[in-house]
Protein backbone atom coordinates (compact mmCIF):
# COMPACT_ATOMS: atom_id res chain seq x y z
CA UNK A 1 0.00 0.00 0.00
CA UNK A 2 1.40 3.44 -0.82
CA UNK A 3 2.29 5.71 2.06
CA UNK A 4 -0.44 8.20 1.18
CA UNK A 5 -3.12 5.49 1.39
CA UNK A 6 -2.06 4.28 4.84
CA UNK A 7 -3.25 7.34 6.77
CA UNK A 8 -6.49 7.33 4.79
CA UNK A 9 -7.01 3.65 5.58
CA UNK A 10 -6.34 4.28 9.27
CA UNK A 11 -8.74 7.21 9.29
CA UNK A 12 -11.38 5.08 7.60
CA UNK A 13 -10.90 2.30 10.17
CA UNK A 14 -11.18 4.83 12.99
CA UNK A 15 -14.40 6.21 11.52
CA UNK A 16 -15.87 2.73 11.12
CA UNK A 17 -15.05 1.91 14.74
CA UNK A 18 -16.57 5.18 15.87
CA UNK A 19 -19.75 4.53 13.87
CA UNK A 20 -20.02 1.04 15.35
CA UNK A 21 -19.85 2.46 18.89
CA UNK A 22 -22.36 5.16 17.99
CA UNK A 23 -24.75 2.55 16.56
CA UNK A 24 -24.49 0.55 19.77
CA UNK A 25 -25.12 3.67 21.85
CA UNK A 26 -28.14 4.60 19.75
CA UNK A 27 -29.62 1.12 20.12
CA UNK A 28 -29.05 1.21 23.90
CA UNK A 29 -30.65 4.65 24.17
CA UNK A 30 -33.58 3.53 22.02
CA UNK A 31 -34.17 0.50 24.26
CA UNK A 32 -33.98 2.71 27.35
CA UNK A 33 -36.44 5.23 25.94
CA UNK A 34 -38.82 2.45 24.90
CA UNK A 35 -38.74 0.98 28.42
CA UNK A 36 -39.30 4.42 29.94
CA UNK A 37 -42.31 5.08 27.70
CA UNK A 38 -43.78 1.72 28.69
CA UNK A 39 -43.34 2.66 32.34
CA UNK A 40 -44.85 6.12 31.73
CA UNK A 41 -47.85 4.51 30.01
CA UNK A 42 -48.33 2.08 32.91
CA UNK A 43 -48.09 4.90 35.46
CA UNK A 44 -50.54 7.01 33.46
CA UNK A 45 -53.05 4.16 33.44
CA UNK A 46 -52.56 3.67 37.18
CA UNK A 47 -53.09 7.39 37.90
CA UNK A 48 -56.25 7.37 35.77
CA UNK A 49 -57.56 4.36 37.68
CA UNK A 50 -56.85 6.09 41.01
CA UNK A 51 -58.51 9.26 39.73
CA UNK A 52 -61.60 7.32 38.63
CA UNK A 53 -61.78 5.55 42.00
CA UNK A 54 -61.45 8.86 43.85
CA UNK A 55 -64.20 10.47 41.77
CA UNK A 56 -66.46 7.49 42.40
CA UNK A 57 -65.75 7.60 46.15
CA UNK A 58 -66.40 11.35 46.25
CA UNK A 59 -69.69 11.01 44.39
CA UNK A 60 -70.83 8.27 46.80
CA UNK A 61 -69.74 10.17 49.92
CA UNK A 62 -72.24 12.28 51.88
CA UNK A 63 -72.00 16.05 51.67
CA UNK A 64 -68.98 17.52 53.36
CA UNK A 65 -69.70 18.88 56.85
CA UNK A 66 -67.99 22.15 55.92
CA UNK A 67 -70.85 22.86 53.52
CA UNK A 68 -73.59 22.29 56.12
CA UNK A 69 -74.77 24.80 58.69
CA UNK A 70 -74.00 24.02 62.29
CA UNK A 71 -77.00 22.62 64.22
CA UNK A 72 -77.35 25.70 66.46
CA UNK A 73 -78.47 27.97 63.57
From Swiss-Prot:
Family: Belongs to the SlyX family.
Matches recorded under HAMAP family: SlyX
InterPro entries, alphabetized: SlyX
Name of the molecule in the record: Protein SlyX homolog
Region (Disordered): 54-73
Organism: Rhodopseudomonas palustris (strain BisA53)
Gene, per the UniProt record: slyX
Composition-biased stretches (Low complexity): 57-67
Pfam families membership: SlyX
Amino acid sequence: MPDSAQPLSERLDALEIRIAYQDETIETLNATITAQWQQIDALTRQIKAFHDRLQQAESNAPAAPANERPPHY
